[in-house]
Amino acid sequence: MKTITKISLTLVLAALLCLTFCCCANKEPEKPRPLFDEDGLYLEENFIFNAALEKDGAHLVENEKTEYCIRYEETTDESVLTAIEELRGYFSAVCGGIEVKTGAGEGKAIRVGKYGYVPSTPLVKTGAYIIEVGENDILIYAENVFGLTNGIYGFMEDYLGCIFLDHETTYIPPVKSMILAKSTDVQEPAFESRTVGDNEAGNYKSFEQKLRVREDETFLTDGCHHSLNMIPKDILAQHKEYYAFIDGARRTGNYLGQGPQLCFSNEEVINLLEEAVVNKEKNKTTDQTVWWDISQQDSMNYCECEKCSALIAESGGNAAAPIFRCVNIIAKRHPELKLSTLAYHYGSSPPENIEFEDNVMIKWCIMSSYGTNDYSAPLTDGATKIAKQQYAEIMGWPELTDHIFVWDYITNYFNYLLPFPCLDAMPGNIRLLRDRGVEGVFSLNAFNNRGSWDRLKVNFASHLLWNPDLNETEFINRFLTVYFGKDAAPYIIRMYRKIHDNTCAPLWVYDFSFYHKIDYLSEMQMDVYYGLLDSAVEACGGDETYLKRLRYERMCLLYASIDLGYGTEEELASMKEEFSRLCAEFSITKLNELGTNTVVEFCR
């Protein structure tokens, strides 16, 4: 009987083991979880889960520990060393730290540099990089320091899940493990030159570098609107004929509220400008290519002398034709130079009967002289007559030149704090520019003070300039979730969406608030925005970091309400007091590009 019992128990145990083995063998491996819920909200917990899911790759962090070090080829470049310190900071946050060493060496490492690596396909653009993940090594490879800094910050964003919120705040997901799949990732930016004119990025170059839009990365542009300054004042004073002929006279000062221009058909003016750019090239202190600029002043005036008028007529009516001819002449005389000129205001349309030299770059601006531009939708939508005309311009310019640089605009320059809902337009416009072969883009945000949605916009613009095909909804929602917290973010996302949906074309960079009093800035809609913002404040649970960012959002809404006079005299007085207090908290004193509207004046 005992023998039978033992045999029975043995059979039962064998069956259980077999069943367990079969279950384990048939069990499917866990799959990555979605990073966004059905409402588009970013799910940090799923990122953390997915970070530990891979089995066969580089076990960078396991259970809050790392066996890796950071190795880099010796360099004295401060930007690379700063980026390495930022990467070290990531490991300090998630696993207590990591060793940083120079040169080659054994053991698991994140290697920053060439380290004998030969790419199968050469990198094309200056800031490009490769990230290769192996079992024991992660290589961040580039041909130059610009690519290395891009590679380090790109690795932190795209692999480690970081977000650079501002110059001093980096979001780091609180992972316990980070396992990366083996891969080779070649990263080429969409544009050779990428610049974002933004208050935060401009004041803190390290932040600009984190966003991979450092101005010194590729070719440099020589600004614009300074041709008058290229000719010595004492010479200009002796030669009135060097100035533009307007309404029957040479105008040496302001005329009709606009500044003076040169007469670009004057041969002596051309010679003086030639001398100036030759000297600039001779005396430059950088090894980088500089496109020296000869352009109109920031004025709507242009020369109407007999010679200039004839050139304008020959070009089909483009009032910048004398400037284009001037630049072409100098470019032909000096093929060793790179010259640029604006296609701006009255010169934005492609001219007829002009062929540009190979060493001339056109700097086209999404800013016309023939009416109100529209930033409520991409140019491809053709939401307004002017949008259709501008679309035709960017389709036409690549037929005349291989070198195009574009100035884009992403804020309201008359009213920095007024919500400016251009997020729907930005991706489509950037893709269009990429598809037309544009070499560089300058996205100009609120650059000399803070503006509405500025932290999101500088991030969004920078990433679009690197990859115009990114999922814009996911990018925006992830940023807002991290920036305002997962509990408050749904209300801010809804508020931003409502503002966009309520906006009627045209949306212009020089709009006054009353232009939109019947659409997105109506009193009824403003009440909806305040309600959503109040819900966000209530939802964030008293977290002061999030509350401060929500106060900034409220300040922007208050600006619109005060400007439009929404409320009784007592209510407006209360709003002005609150607005003034918030401006002081965020160190805001001026409310527009020129600084002519101060907080004190606005709140009187």
Predicted segments, located by residue:
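Substrate-binding cleft/loops of secretory-pathway carbohydrate-active enzymes
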Residues: 340-371, 417-425, 450-458
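Conserved radical SAM core fold
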Residues: 259, 299-301, 365-380, 411-413
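Gram-positive cell-envelope targeting signals
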Residues: 1-33
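Catalytic domains of carbohydrate-active enzymes that cleave complex glycans
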Residues: 437, 464-604
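Acidic, contiguous N-terminal accessory segments
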Residues: 24-130, 176-185
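Feature activates predominantly on carbohydrate-active enzymes
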Residues: 67, 78, 82-86, 90-92, ...
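Structured mid-domain segments that build the active-site/substrate or prosthetic-cofactor binding neighborhood
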Residues: 265-269, 279, 381-487, 494
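Acidic, His- and aromatic-enriched active-site or binding-groove loops in soluble protein domains
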Residues: 312-329, 357-376, 433, 463-470
